[in-house]
């Protein structure tokens, strides 16, 4: 019986060896081996631990790297003289209180093991007086070090170092949601960053004599560096514009889909989630009602408001429901219009003044027109027209994930005829019951990534590359799927018809004329949006999408600020400042006061 088992074992090992790579310099277990001999298949780790790859921005500035770090661990008992400890480390009393508050998960956590990260100068002080402080434990170990305080949702964390955060998150109901959605690039590309150790797979007999390998050896490989699409300077600048406010800002290069800036507000330092001495700050993030740990641009889908009029106009042009010269009365018996303006005699004027009644009638033309084949059945016509509208709108990458490299991307939502049949409890719903779609309200939900990508599609006249955060892996390029061009179902000529109206938005009389960059020679094309909040106490949400330069776009931006009021006064200024910063490298003097006022409000969180 044992002989039969040995024969079976040798045959299996021979088969595995035969499947090994032909360039592997190993010997196999031949069938001529003595079947009475028992062999042991081993897996032996080769010397060397792979270095984790670095994260670099688009200009090759290092954002995250693995470096030595010094930790000072305090004994839980007896309590130390904190003022004396502060003198030892060169800290004043305010710094001592702040560092202890940051290191403890909650006030009064006296027995919590406190650790402090130290600078080289502080380490020298501790070593010099170590005899007087025998209970202090100083250690050195390699850790991920962030060279920037910006980009938390982009950079994310290495889960091995984020265990304290993950442990704190498990103890809160909201934290269980956060811990799956904040890994960023460190989590998404972990396998490439980590590299892998080398392993040999020797086959030995009972006396330990080698008999080749039982499978292919694994080669040692260092972790690969990731070259991000992010512009670190632009990212830091954009975060100052949002600060403590709830919302997001996403900036893309429409020509490539590369994400230039990705802000989720309120902003926080990425090192907070992994630093051993910031348990208190992590607790504040987890418990905050403003939900700073929510990755808003990717995981939160909201009604887009009036910026969605651009999509509805493009679909209506494609399907022949309107033409560029189509005009409608500003009939406020249909829907209110918050802007006083001339009669929208064509699409350009309708976009310039964001006339709600104009786009109510555009969408009505789309939904209520009855094809000849359905002339006697308006119910069927509405169902067919809504389904057709949805098919064209979905080609913008909506109602589905874009396939970006941000963890847990949400798909957003577009209603179907079946959805309304169920919601209205009848198939005989009318356009009047779904007209909110015409102004980007109601059941439509888009993510920030989708909003920015929508602007990029219009900038490109109908095509896009999926938005992504990594432009190069090691010495290579991005993941192959980010090089695949996607096209909408809208002809390019119809996107060109939107451009005059989008330019007019930022010209005299337009809804965002104050945000014009004409003084520095930059023509911006954009669209403002004010999203109804639905609550009685809070302000509406502010939105803006646009791109610049209008005729040769190099940057597309989407901004969404919760409870900030009008898109023209809150969102548009942030967007154009980011455009100007990226295209010129500086802000014109006439907008410096404007910039300071926005940043001041951002620091105060409103």
Question: Predicted regions span which residues?
Answer:
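Beta-lactam-recognizing serine transpeptidase/beta-lactamase-like catalytic domain environment
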Residues: 64, 204-215, 255-307, 311-564, ...
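Periplasmic/cell-envelope proteins involved in peptidoglycan metabolism and beta-lactam response
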Residues: 2-15, 19-279, 301, 324, ...
């Amino acid at each position: 019986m044992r002989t039969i088992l040995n024969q079976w074992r040798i045959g299996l090992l021979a088969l595995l060896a035969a499947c090994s790579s032909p360039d592997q310099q190993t010997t196999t277990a031949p069938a001529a081996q003595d079947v009475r001999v028992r062999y042991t298949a081993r897996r032996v780790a080769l010397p060397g631990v792979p270095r984790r790859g670095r994260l670099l921005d688009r200009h090759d500035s290092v954002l995250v790297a693995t470096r030595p770090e010094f930790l000072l661990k305090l004994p839980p008992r007896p309590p130390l003289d904190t003022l004396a400890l502060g003198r030892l480390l060169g800290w004043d009393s305010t710094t001592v209180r702040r560092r202890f508050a940051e290191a403890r998960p909650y006030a009064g956590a006296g027995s919590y093991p406190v650790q402090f990260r130290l600078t080289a100068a502080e380490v020298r002080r501790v070593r010099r007086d170590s005899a007087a402080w025998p209970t202090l434990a100083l250690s050195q170990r390699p850790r991920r070090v962030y060279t920037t305080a910006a980009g938390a949702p982009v950079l994310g964390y290495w889960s091995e170092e984020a265990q304290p955060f993950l442990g704190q998150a498990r103890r809160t109901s909201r934290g269980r949601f956060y811990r799956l959605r904040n890994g960023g690039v460190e989590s998404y590309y972990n396998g490439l960053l980590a590299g892998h150790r080398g392993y040999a797979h020797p086959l030995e007999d009972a006396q330990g004599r080698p008999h080749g390998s039982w499978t292919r050896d694994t080669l040692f490989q260092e972790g690969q560096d990731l070259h991000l699409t992010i512009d670190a300077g632009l990212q830091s600048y954009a975060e100052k514009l949002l600060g403590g406010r709830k919302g997001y800002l996403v900036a893309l290069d429409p020509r490539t889909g590369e994400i230039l800036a990705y802000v989720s507000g309120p902003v926080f330092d990425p090192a907070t989630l992994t630093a051993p001495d910031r348990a208190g700050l992590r607790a504040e993030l987890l418990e905050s009602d403003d939900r700073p740990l929510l990755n808003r641009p990717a995981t939160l889908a909201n009604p887009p408001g009036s910026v969605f009029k651009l999509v509805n106009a493009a679909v209506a042009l494609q399907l022949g429901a309107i033409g560029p010269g189509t005009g409608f009365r500003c009939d406020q018996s249909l829907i209110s219009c918050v802007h006083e303006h001339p009669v929208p005699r064509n699409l350009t004027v309708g976009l310039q003044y964001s006339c709600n009644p104009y786009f109510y009638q555009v969408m009505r033309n789309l939904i209520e027109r009855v094809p000849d084949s359905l002339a006697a059945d308006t119910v069927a016509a509405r169902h067919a027209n809504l389904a057709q509208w949805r098919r064209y709108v979905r080609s913008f990458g909506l109602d589905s994930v874009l396939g970006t490299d941000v963890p847990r991307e949400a798909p957003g939502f577009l209603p179907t005829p079946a959805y309304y049949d169920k919601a209205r409890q009848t198939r005989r719903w009318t356009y009047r019951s779904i007209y909110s779609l015409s102004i980007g309200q109601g059941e439509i939900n888009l993510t920030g990534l989708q909003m920015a990508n929508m602007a990029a599609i219009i900038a490109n006249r109908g095509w896009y590359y999926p938005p992504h955060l990594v432009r190069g892996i090691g010495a290579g390029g991005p993941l192959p799927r980010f090089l695949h061009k996607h096209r909408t179902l809208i002809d390019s000529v119809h996107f060109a018809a939107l451009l005059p109206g989008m330019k007019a938005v930022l010209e005299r009389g337009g809804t965002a004329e104050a945000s014009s960059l004409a003084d520095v020679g930059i023509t911006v094309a954009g669209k403002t949006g004010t999203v109804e909040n639905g609550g009685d106490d809070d302000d509406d949400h502010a939105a803006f999408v646009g791109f610049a330069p209008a005729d040769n776009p190099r940057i597309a931006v989407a901004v969404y600020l919760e409870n900030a009021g009008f898109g023209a006064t809150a969102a548009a200024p942030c967007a154009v400042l980011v455009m100007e910063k990226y295209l010129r490298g500086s802000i014109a003097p006439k907008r410096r006061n404007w910039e300071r006022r926005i940043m001041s409000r951002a620091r105060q969180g409103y």
